[in-house]
Design a protein with these regions (language model features):
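Membrane-interfacial terminal anchoring regions of lipid-handling membrane enzymes
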Residues: 1-77, 81-479, 515, 733-738, ...
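Acidic catalytic loop of the alpha/beta-hydrolase fold
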Residues: 57, 677-681
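Short alpha-helix in the alpha/beta-hydrolase fold that links the catalytic acid
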Residues: 64-66, 512, 668, 682-691, ...
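Short, surface-exposed "cap/lid" segments of acyl-processing enzymes
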Residues: 474-534
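Catalytic histidine-centered segment of alpha/beta-hydrolase-like enzymes
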Residues: 536, 706-717
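Gly/Ala-rich beta-loop-alpha elbow adjacent to hydrolase catalytic centers
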Residues: 568-572, 576
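Active-site nucleophile loop of the alpha/beta-hydrolase fold
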Residues: 591-602
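Short beta-strand/loop motif that positions the catalytic acidic residue
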Residues: 666, 672-674, 678
């Protein structure tokens, strides 16, 4: 054997080993991926099925058959473009039973199987605009007439129409064709007699596959593909770069089945009756006519397939962010907070208009609205800036003039656009214009007003629902006691999120809120979950639900002002301190009034044991001996519950421990107020809170009071004045800092402007820079 032959054999063996490892890794990734099937029950045994799927990368040719076989027990055939049947990948596809569109007779393979009621088929077709598509060599729309859409599912539509037409003609009780013509047509499809044609319906099932997340970057798959050498074309390399990103990490795959499109019923529509009226001989001639009834029906069916696939998309955060970037007006600056609010607005629109949402989308958009850190959002921002879809500056984000202009109607990525897959997918989903256009173009004050109204209404609806569910004349106070409230002055100096105490209601802090509103502060009185209704409602709550109520209050106040102080009375003070520790950059200050780290009633330590005993008694059917509530004698009987659930006491203990551990993380100005003779909260709680605060800007005020509820009744105006002074001081400091930051940024911009003019010596360029400075200043 010649040395060159040995070298070629060694190289071929090396490529084979590498490809085998790639395929083995691919299978491993597919097994690890989380796959969710939606609406799979539409598949019926009496159907002859063609699956028409959205097609972004060649990975679907391997992915879909594996998933359908593993999760549904189906063994579909696959008809794929000939461009993929090259090199070792082509050999693997042939070995797995996949059929090349150019190397097979579709009549004797696909249509024959459909007529006999065999296994279903997945038809993968090249988009006509692809450079590797034979149909795209003559016309960018695939050789179709100029009025055609150039849709990627025309081949699947044509096969389905051919199968439905032949089934209808073969099974018709009276045919106009001669027996010789029938026999010749049967032979065309590899059939012996009309008895082989069963009575199943020919249907196309739209199938949408959505990946989440897709983080596009260089990957091992792309490097492995380079070993394919001359067998890998540009389109394959472009798509493999996406495939590697798709399966380079834990991926979630949503596969949604649309409602079956009955091709027989489609052909019985008045506009398509000429198709079914044709004889076999006439049909063969009309099928080759691009303006004939067969081609018109195929194009109409392809459009229906396209729309059905788009309707089944599983909308996720990548979709919403991509659509928002695409719709962001040129020249308009968006801050990070703008993206957060507008993404939540997109989510609200998606709830109304999209058929299916990713299961994590609601939690992600709520986290964005609450200004919580979300790695997925941070990664999307980074990718958008890195790929130059957006230009980042200290003023905000501006859309790049070079941003992607999507191709209308494309369901498949074009060569060289692997990095744009997320945007292509969103464009193909046809949710961009309906979901994101309003959110991107609406003025800031409109977005904030809409979100504020929505969030306040949600809080009120939740209260009304809980109040109606747990209503009891003995325990429930009037609705106005438990309703959350929003108070706004004419001119807002700042905002306050105000939380009430344990077993109380928003009415408890209403007097303080009214005082602060008269001093120019907007106040949102939070209703902690389980409060303001009945003790049975409180007994079912966890302290995390109380914290979530406070965070929702922050989101509401954030639509009014950036200067937000959080505060609370008693347990509400603990929640305020905890929120200030966790959301360090969200608040300008925090205050607590009689917040408990310790309580005077030492019997609270017995509560866990009593709860365990209650559970044991209920387990053995002795629930009448269990004691779930204890009597409570509150100061404000018109507000507080008169029965205290023991499970609520356990949650109170948990929130006190959580607060004690978070005090050192508080880095914003803080005010701690304590009553010297508090009969409920141990007075040592105030000094201990003050001592463990992480901030240096802190104040401790001790008032000579022998009551716990010092924010109502005698002596409360002094408490109000103390809180007011703290808020005014915090507002002044924040205002001074804003002016200082603005001056520094303005100085930096002027410095760059003067340096630029000095270097260029051209007044015109200086004038252009000055105009740019004016635009930035106005946007700020």
């Amino acid at each position: 054997m010649r040395r060159s032959d040995k070298g070629e054999l060694l190289m071929a063996a090396s490529v084979t080993v590498q490809l085998t490892d790639w395929l083995r890794g691919l299978s491993s990734k597919l097994m690890q991926a989380e796959v969710r099937l939606h609406n799979a029950s539409v598949i019926d045994p009496d159907m002859a099925v063609i699956f028409a799927a959205n097609h972004f990368t060649r990975i679907e040719t391997l992915l879909l058959p594996c998933i359908l076989q593993e999760h549904m027990g189906l063994t579909p055939g696959s008809l794929v473009p000939a461009a993929l049947f090259r090199g070792r990948v082509g050999k693997y596809l042939k070995a797995s039973g996949t059929v090349s569109a150019d190397e097979v007779n579709e009549d004797t393979t696909v249509v024959r199987m459909l007529l006999r009621g065999g296994h279903p088929w997945i038809v993968f077709t090249d988009h006509p605009a692809h450079p590797n598509s034979k149909r795209g060599q003559d016309n960018v729309l695939g050789g179709l007439p100029p009025q055609a859409d150039g849709l990627p599912h025309e081949e699947a539509a044509a096969l389905a129409i051919r199968a439905a037409y032949c089934r209808g003609r073969f099974r018709a009780p009276q045919r106009r064709e001669s027996q010789e013509e029938v026999t010749r047509t049967l032979r065309r499809f590899g059939l012996e007699s009309t008895e082989e044609v069963d009575a199943r319906r020919t249907v196309i099932i739209p199938l949408n596959i959505t990946y989440y997340p897709i983080r596009l970057r260089d990957n091992l798959f792309m490097r492995a593909a380079e070993h394919l050498g001359r067998h890998a074309n540009a389109q394959a390399l472009s798509e493999i770069s996406v495939q590697g990103s798709v399966l380079d990490e834990t991926i979630e795959i949503d596969i949604s089945f649309g409602e079956p499109l009955d091709i027989g019923a489609f052909l019985n529509r008045p506009e398509h009756t000429p198709v079914m009226a044709c004889t076999f001989r006439a049909a063969a001639e009309l099928e080759s006519d691009p303006d004939g009834p067969f081609q018109r029906a195929a194009r109409a069916l392809a459009r229906e397939i396209r729309d059905a696939i788009r309707a089944e998309v599983t909308v996720n955060l990548d979709h919403l962010f991509a659509g928002l970037v695409l719709e962001q007006p040129e020249g308009r600056l968006f801050k990070e907070r703008d993206y957060r609010e507008r993404l939540f607005l997109c989510y609200l629109q998606a709830q109304k208009k999209a058929r299916r949402l990713h299961p994590d989308l609601k939690a992600q958009c709520l986290a964005l609205l609450h200004d919580e850190e979300l790695p997925a959002f941070r990664e999307l921002l980074r990718i958008a800036v890195e790929k130059r879809y957006m230009l980042a500056s200290e003023w905000g984000y501006r859309v790049s003039p070079e941003r992607l202009r999507p191709l209308p109607g494309s369901l498949v990525i074009a060569a060289g656009t692997a990095r744009d897959t997320v945007l292509r997918e969103f464009e193909a989903a046809h949710v961009r214009s309906t979901l994101c256009r309003y959110a991107a173009w609406a003025p800031d004050f409109v977005v904030k007003a809409y979100l504020r109204r929505y969030l306040v209404r949600q809080d009120l609806r939740e209260f009304e629902k809980d109040y109606a569910c747990f209503y009891h004349p003995r325990d429930c106070k009037p609705p106005e006691v438990g309703q959350p409230f929003l108070l706004c002055p004419w001119r807002i100096r700042g905002g306050v999120v105000l939380a009430h105490g344990y077993m109380a209601a928003p009415m408890e802090v209403r007097a303080l809120a009214e005082h602060l509103r008269r001093r120019g502060f907007a106040v949102y009185g939070v209703r902690l979950q389980g409060h303001g209704t009945a003790p049975e409602d409180l007994a079912q709550q966890q302290w995390e639900n109380w914290y979530a109520s406070v965070v929702r209050g922050y989101a509401i106040m954030r639509t009014l002002t950036d200067n937000i102080v959080i505060g609370g009375f008693s347990t509400g003070g603990c929640l305020a301190l905890l929120a200030a520790a966790r959301k360090k950059k969200s608040f300008s200050g925090v205050f607590s009034i009689c917040a408990p780290l310790y309580v005077r009633n030492y019997s609270i330590r017995l509560v866990p044991s009593i709860i365990s005993m209650n559970a044991l008694l209920k387990r053995f059917g002795q629930s009448h001996y269990a004691r779930d509530f204890v009597e409570n004698d509150p100061e404000n009987k018109h507000i507080n519950y008169t029965r205290n659930p023991l499970t609520g006491v356990r949650q109170l203990t948990a929130i006190m421990h959580a607060t004690a551990g978070a005090l050192s993380d508080i880095e914003i100005p803080a005010l701690v107020i304590q009553a010297s003779q508090d009969p409920t909260v141990d007075p040592s709680s105030g000094p201990d809170i003050f001592a463990h605060l992480g901030t240096r800007q802190k104040q401790y005020s001790l008032f000579e009071r022998d009551r716990h509820g010092i924010i109502n009744g005698e002596g409360s105006p002094e408490i109000f004045a103390q809180v007011e002074q703290f808020l005014l001081r915090t507002a002044r400091e924040l205002s001074s800092r804003k002016y200082w930051l603005f001056g520094r940024r303005l100085g930096q911009t002027l410095s760059r402007l003067f340096v630029h003019r000095h270097r260029t010596g051209q007044g015109s360029e200086g004038g252009s820079a000055a105009e740019d400075l004016e635009i930035k200043t106005n946007n700020y």
